[in-house]
Amino acid sequence: LNVITECKEYLTSQINASKWGSEPLSFGVPTASADSDILDSLRAQGFRVAGDQIPSNTNDSTFWTLERSGGSLEKTIASTDTIEQDIEMNGYANLYWEAQVYDTNVRRDKDVLTWIESQDYWFTTWGEWFSSSHPASESNRADQSITLKGTAANNGGWDVPGNTYFSVEGAQIIDVIRIDEGILNELTADDHHLKEGYRILNESSVTLTIPQDALVQITWEGEAVDVLIEEGSFNNFTPFMAVGHHTTDLFEWSSPFQESSIRFTWLIEPQPELQPSWILPMLAVLIILVAPVAIQYTLKHDKGMQAHSEEE
Protein backbone atom coordinates (compact mmCIF):
# COMPACT_ATOMS: atom_id res chain seq x y z
CA LEU A 1 0.00 0.00 0.00
CA ASN A 2 3.02 2.29 0.21
CA VAL A 3 2.87 2.51 -3.58
CA ILE A 4 -0.23 4.70 -3.25
CA THR A 5 1.65 7.24 -1.16
CA GLU A 6 4.72 7.06 -3.40
CA CYS A 7 2.65 7.61 -6.56
CA LYS A 8 0.96 10.66 -5.07
CA GLU A 9 4.24 12.15 -3.85
CA TYR A 10 5.84 11.61 -7.25
CA LEU A 11 2.97 13.29 -9.10
CA THR A 12 2.60 16.29 -6.79
CA SER A 13 6.34 16.90 -6.96
CA GLN A 14 6.13 17.19 -10.76
CA ILE A 15 2.88 18.96 -11.66
CA ASN A 16 -0.53 20.16 -10.45
CA ALA A 17 -3.18 17.51 -10.92
CA SER A 18 -5.70 19.84 -12.58
CA LYS A 19 -6.59 23.44 -13.28
CA TRP A 20 -9.13 22.99 -10.48
CA GLY A 21 -6.70 21.79 -7.83
CA SER A 22 -3.16 20.65 -7.16
CA GLU A 23 -4.03 17.40 -5.38
CA PRO A 24 -4.79 14.33 -7.52
CA LEU A 25 -8.19 12.67 -7.14
CA SER A 26 -7.85 9.77 -9.62
CA PHE A 27 -5.96 6.50 -9.24
CA GLY A 28 -5.63 3.66 -11.73
CA VAL A 29 -6.19 0.17 -10.35
CA PRO A 30 -5.01 -2.45 -12.88
CA THR A 31 -7.24 -5.24 -11.58
CA ALA A 32 -10.92 -6.10 -11.85
CA SER A 33 -11.40 -5.79 -8.09
CA ALA A 34 -9.89 -3.99 -5.13
CA ASP A 35 -10.21 -5.04 -1.51
CA SER A 36 -11.33 -2.71 1.26
CA ASP A 37 -7.75 -2.08 2.43
CA ILE A 38 -6.77 -0.64 -0.96
CA LEU A 39 -9.89 1.51 -1.21
CA ASP A 40 -9.45 2.76 2.38
CA SER A 41 -5.83 3.65 1.64
CA LEU A 42 -6.87 5.55 -1.49
CA ARG A 43 -9.43 7.51 0.51
CA ALA A 44 -6.89 8.26 3.23
CA GLN A 45 -4.50 9.71 0.62
CA GLY A 46 -7.23 11.98 -0.77
CA PHE A 47 -8.10 9.99 -3.88
CA ARG A 48 -11.79 10.01 -4.78
CA VAL A 49 -12.03 8.03 -8.03
CA ALA A 50 -10.51 4.70 -9.08
CA GLY A 51 -10.76 2.76 -12.33
CA ASP A 52 -11.03 1.55 -14.91
CA GLN A 53 -11.48 -2.20 -14.62
CA ILE A 54 -13.35 -2.07 -11.32
CA PRO A 55 -17.16 -2.22 -11.65
CA SER A 56 -18.71 1.25 -11.58
CA ASN A 57 -20.19 2.76 -8.44
CA THR A 58 -21.08 6.45 -8.50
CA ASN A 59 -23.64 6.31 -5.69
CA ASP A 60 -21.10 6.96 -2.92
CA SER A 61 -20.56 10.70 -2.45
CA THR A 62 -17.10 10.10 -0.95
CA PHE A 63 -15.57 7.65 -3.45
CA TRP A 64 -16.36 6.52 -6.99
CA THR A 65 -15.23 3.63 -9.14
CA LEU A 66 -15.52 3.95 -12.93
CA GLU A 67 -15.21 1.03 -15.30
CA ARG A 68 -14.11 1.26 -18.90
CA SER A 69 -16.88 2.25 -21.29
CA GLY A 70 -16.61 2.80 -25.03
CA GLY A 71 -13.52 0.79 -25.89
CA SER A 72 -10.24 2.29 -27.09
CA LEU A 73 -8.99 5.22 -29.18
CA GLU A 74 -6.52 2.94 -30.98
CA LYS A 75 -6.74 2.79 -34.77
CA THR A 76 -8.56 -0.32 -36.07
CA ILE A 77 -9.98 -0.90 -32.56
CA ALA A 78 -11.84 2.37 -31.93
CA SER A 79 -15.52 2.10 -32.82
CA THR A 80 -18.32 4.66 -32.84
CA ASP A 81 -20.82 1.82 -32.44
CA THR A 82 -19.07 0.61 -29.29
CA ILE A 83 -19.04 4.12 -27.86
CA GLU A 84 -22.76 4.60 -28.47
CA GLN A 85 -23.67 1.15 -27.15
CA ASP A 86 -21.66 1.57 -23.95
CA ILE A 87 -23.08 5.06 -23.35
CA GLU A 88 -26.55 3.57 -23.70
CA MET A 89 -25.62 0.89 -21.15
CA ASN A 90 -23.53 2.90 -18.66
CA GLY A 91 -24.59 6.51 -19.16
CA TYR A 92 -21.07 7.73 -19.88
CA ALA A 93 -17.99 7.09 -22.03
CA ASN A 94 -14.64 6.22 -20.44
CA LEU A 95 -12.26 5.26 -23.24
CA TYR A 96 -8.88 3.56 -22.98
CA TRP A 97 -5.71 5.00 -24.49
CA GLU A 98 -2.09 3.90 -24.32
CA ALA A 99 0.29 5.83 -26.57
CA GLN A 100 3.15 3.37 -26.42
CA VAL A 101 3.34 -0.35 -25.76
CA TYR A 102 6.93 -1.40 -25.10
CA ASP A 103 8.83 0.22 -28.00
CA THR A 104 5.84 0.46 -30.34
CA ASN A 105 3.97 3.74 -30.81
CA VAL A 106 0.22 3.22 -30.97
CA ARG A 107 -1.72 5.15 -33.61
CA ARG A 108 -4.94 6.92 -32.66
CA ASP A 109 -8.00 6.69 -34.88
CA LYS A 110 -8.33 10.22 -36.26
CA ASP A 111 -11.68 9.55 -37.93
CA VAL A 112 -13.23 8.36 -34.68
CA LEU A 113 -11.69 11.31 -32.82
CA THR A 114 -13.26 13.72 -35.32
CA TRP A 115 -16.62 12.02 -34.86
CA ILE A 116 -16.34 12.18 -31.06
CA GLU A 117 -15.64 15.91 -31.14
CA SER A 118 -18.82 16.49 -33.18
CA GLN A 119 -21.12 14.86 -30.63
CA ASP A 120 -23.09 16.37 -27.75
CA TYR A 121 -20.61 15.22 -25.12
CA TRP A 122 -19.32 16.88 -21.99
CA PHE A 123 -15.55 16.42 -22.27
CA THR A 124 -14.43 15.93 -18.70
CA THR A 125 -12.12 13.93 -16.42
CA TRP A 126 -12.65 11.54 -13.53
CA GLY A 127 -11.85 14.14 -10.89
CA GLU A 128 -13.85 16.93 -12.51
CA TRP A 129 -16.97 14.80 -12.91
CA PHE A 130 -16.80 13.62 -9.30
CA SER A 131 -16.19 17.15 -8.00
CA SER A 132 -19.09 18.69 -9.93
CA SER A 133 -21.67 16.13 -8.84
CA HIS A 134 -23.33 18.37 -6.23
CA PRO A 135 -26.69 19.79 -7.31
CA ALA A 136 -28.06 23.08 -6.02
CA SER A 137 -30.55 23.12 -3.16
CA GLU A 138 -33.85 24.95 -2.82
CA SER A 139 -33.45 28.23 -0.94
CA ASN A 140 -36.84 29.88 -1.43
CA ARG A 141 -40.04 29.31 -3.39
CA ALA A 142 -42.89 31.59 -4.47
CA ASP A 143 -45.98 30.98 -6.60
CA GLN A 144 -44.14 31.34 -9.92
CA SER A 145 -40.47 31.25 -9.03
CA ILE A 146 -37.86 29.36 -7.08
CA THR A 147 -34.44 30.34 -5.77
CA LEU A 148 -31.66 27.76 -5.90
CA LYS A 149 -28.46 27.94 -3.87
CA GLY A 150 -25.16 26.45 -5.01
CA THR A 151 -23.77 23.75 -2.75
CA ALA A 152 -20.23 22.75 -1.81
CA ALA A 153 -18.28 20.15 -3.74
CA ASN A 154 -18.34 16.57 -2.51
CA ASN A 155 -16.12 15.77 0.43
CA GLY A 156 -12.54 15.90 -0.81
CA GLY A 157 -13.43 17.10 -4.30
CA TRP A 158 -12.01 20.12 -6.08
CA ASP A 159 -13.79 23.45 -5.67
CA VAL A 160 -15.79 23.38 -8.91
CA PRO A 161 -19.35 24.49 -9.73
CA GLY A 162 -22.04 21.86 -9.39
CA ASN A 163 -24.39 20.56 -12.07
CA THR A 164 -28.16 20.73 -11.59
CA TYR A 165 -31.13 19.68 -13.69
CA PHE A 166 -34.35 21.59 -12.97
CA SER A 167 -37.81 21.02 -14.42
CA VAL A 168 -41.28 22.35 -13.68
CA GLU A 169 -44.31 20.43 -14.90
CA GLY A 170 -47.28 22.36 -16.22
CA ALA A 171 -45.51 25.71 -16.60
CA GLN A 172 -43.16 27.56 -18.95
CA ILE A 173 -39.78 28.86 -17.78
CA ILE A 174 -39.34 32.51 -18.77
CA ASP A 175 -36.24 33.68 -16.89
CA VAL A 176 -33.09 32.45 -15.17
CA ILE A 177 -31.03 35.03 -13.33
CA ARG A 178 -28.42 35.17 -10.60
CA ILE A 179 -29.71 37.41 -7.82
CA ASP A 180 -26.57 37.82 -5.73
CA GLU A 181 -23.54 39.82 -6.87
CA GLY A 182 -22.36 37.24 -9.39
CA ILE A 183 -23.10 36.79 -13.09
CA LEU A 184 -24.58 33.69 -14.69
CA ASN A 185 -24.07 33.50 -18.44
CA GLU A 186 -26.23 31.54 -20.84
CA LEU A 187 -24.60 28.44 -22.27
CA THR A 188 -24.98 27.20 -25.84
CA ALA A 189 -24.83 23.76 -27.42
CA ASP A 190 -21.23 24.57 -28.40
CA ASP A 191 -20.07 24.60 -24.76
CA HIS A 192 -18.49 21.22 -24.01
CA HIS A 193 -16.21 22.04 -21.06
CA LEU A 194 -17.29 22.68 -17.49
CA LYS A 195 -17.97 26.30 -16.58
CA GLU A 196 -20.63 28.33 -14.77
CA GLY A 197 -23.82 29.00 -16.69
CA TYR A 198 -27.29 27.79 -17.63
CA ARG A 199 -29.17 26.62 -20.71
CA ILE A 200 -32.93 26.40 -21.12
CA LEU A 201 -33.52 22.98 -22.68
CA ASN A 202 -37.22 23.38 -23.43
CA GLU A 203 -40.16 25.33 -22.04
CA SER A 204 -40.17 23.39 -18.77
CA SER A 205 -36.56 22.43 -18.02
CA VAL A 206 -33.15 24.04 -17.60
CA THR A 207 -29.63 22.84 -16.87
CA LEU A 208 -27.46 24.89 -14.51
CA THR A 209 -23.84 24.84 -13.38
CA ILE A 210 -23.38 27.13 -10.39
CA PRO A 211 -20.73 27.60 -7.68
CA GLN A 212 -21.14 27.25 -3.95
CA ASP A 213 -23.46 29.83 -2.32
CA ALA A 214 -24.57 31.36 -5.65
CA LEU A 215 -28.26 32.34 -5.64
CA VAL A 216 -30.16 31.74 -8.88
CA GLN A 217 -33.82 32.56 -9.40
CA ILE A 218 -35.91 30.66 -11.95
CA THR A 219 -39.23 32.22 -12.95
CA TRP A 220 -42.07 30.61 -14.88
CA GLU A 221 -45.55 31.28 -16.21
CA GLY A 222 -48.48 29.06 -15.39
CA GLU A 223 -49.38 26.92 -12.43
CA ALA A 224 -46.62 24.50 -11.56
CA VAL A 225 -47.85 20.97 -10.92
CA ASP A 226 -44.53 19.50 -9.89
CA VAL A 227 -40.97 20.79 -9.46
CA LEU A 228 -37.88 18.59 -9.83
CA ILE A 229 -34.35 19.47 -8.66
CA GLU A 230 -31.69 16.80 -9.17
CA GLU A 231 -28.07 16.23 -10.06
CA GLY A 232 -27.39 16.83 -13.73
CA SER A 233 -24.47 16.76 -16.12
CA PHE A 234 -22.80 19.81 -17.58
CA ASN A 235 -24.99 21.40 -20.29
CA ASN A 236 -27.15 18.26 -20.11
CA PHE A 237 -24.50 16.43 -22.15
CA THR A 238 -23.23 12.88 -21.74
CA PRO A 239 -20.00 12.73 -19.71
CA PHE A 240 -17.15 11.68 -22.00
CA MET A 241 -13.72 10.79 -20.61
CA ALA A 242 -10.54 9.40 -22.12
CA VAL A 243 -7.95 7.74 -19.91
CA GLY A 244 -4.25 7.64 -20.73
CA HIS A 245 -2.79 4.50 -19.17
CA HIS A 246 0.85 3.87 -18.19
CA THR A 247 1.77 7.48 -18.97
CA THR A 248 5.54 7.79 -18.64
CA ASP A 249 5.96 10.98 -20.68
CA LEU A 250 3.02 13.35 -20.19
CA PHE A 251 4.31 16.01 -22.58
CA GLU A 252 4.92 13.60 -25.46
CA TRP A 253 1.73 11.60 -24.97
CA SER A 254 -0.53 14.64 -24.65
CA SER A 255 1.02 16.61 -27.54
CA PRO A 256 -1.15 15.04 -30.30
CA PHE A 257 -4.29 16.13 -28.41
CA GLN A 258 -3.36 19.74 -27.70
CA GLU A 259 -5.94 21.02 -30.20
CA SER A 260 -8.56 18.41 -29.34
CA SER A 261 -11.73 19.08 -27.35
CA ILE A 262 -11.30 15.78 -25.54
CA ARG A 263 -10.02 15.92 -21.97
CA PHE A 264 -7.81 13.15 -20.63
CA THR A 265 -7.33 11.59 -17.23
CA TRP A 266 -3.62 10.76 -17.41
CA LEU A 267 -2.60 7.88 -15.15
CA ILE A 268 1.03 8.85 -14.69
CA GLU A 269 3.81 6.39 -13.91
CA PRO A 270 7.38 7.35 -12.96
CA GLN A 271 9.88 6.99 -15.78
CA PRO A 272 12.22 4.02 -15.38
CA GLU A 273 15.32 4.98 -13.44
CA LEU A 274 18.62 5.01 -15.32
CA GLN A 275 21.31 2.67 -14.07
CA PRO A 276 23.67 4.14 -11.45
CA SER A 277 25.88 6.82 -12.93
CA TRP A 278 29.14 4.98 -12.09
CA ILE A 279 28.41 2.43 -14.82
CA LEU A 280 28.97 4.94 -17.64
CA PRO A 281 32.48 5.96 -16.47
CA MET A 282 33.34 2.29 -15.98
CA LEU A 283 32.17 1.53 -19.52
CA ALA A 284 34.27 4.42 -20.82
CA VAL A 285 37.34 3.15 -18.98
CA LEU A 286 36.70 -0.35 -20.26
CA ILE A 287 36.43 0.91 -23.84
CA ILE A 288 39.62 2.95 -23.45
CA LEU A 289 41.49 -0.08 -22.13
CA VAL A 290 40.09 -2.53 -24.64
CA ALA A 291 40.45 -0.35 -27.73
CA PRO A 292 44.31 -0.41 -27.93
CA VAL A 293 44.32 -4.18 -27.46
CA ALA A 294 41.72 -4.59 -30.17
CA ILE A 295 43.67 -2.32 -32.51
CA GLN A 296 46.92 -4.25 -31.94
CA TYR A 297 45.10 -7.51 -32.52
CA THR A 298 43.56 -6.20 -35.73
CA LEU A 299 46.93 -4.97 -37.05
CA LYS A 300 48.61 -8.29 -36.28
CA HIS A 301 45.71 -10.15 -37.83
CA ASP A 302 45.87 -8.04 -41.01
CA LYS A 303 49.66 -8.53 -41.30
CA GLY A 304 49.20 -12.24 -40.89
CA MET A 305 46.54 -12.33 -43.57
CA GLN A 306 48.75 -10.25 -45.89
CA ALA A 307 51.72 -12.59 -45.42
CA HIS A 308 49.51 -15.59 -45.97
CA SER A 309 48.18 -14.02 -49.16
CA GLU A 310 51.71 -13.33 -50.45
CA GLU A 311 52.73 -16.93 -49.77
CA GLU A 312 49.82 -18.13 -51.91
What are these model-derived regions, one by one?
Residues K75-D86:
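A short, acidic, amphipathic alpha-helical segment used as a generic capping/interface helix at domain edges
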Residues L299-E312:
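Cytoplasmic C-terminal tails of single-pass
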Residues V49-S56, N94-A189:
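C-terminal domain-boundary segment and adjacent tail
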Residues S18, E84-Q85, S139:
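Short boundary motifs at domain starts and secondary-structure transition points
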Residues L1-L73, Y102-R108, P272-L280:
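Catalytic domains of cell-wall/extracellular-matrix polysaccharide-remodeling enzymes
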Residues S145-K300:
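C-terminal beta-sandwich/jelly-roll accessory domains of carbohydrate-active enzymes
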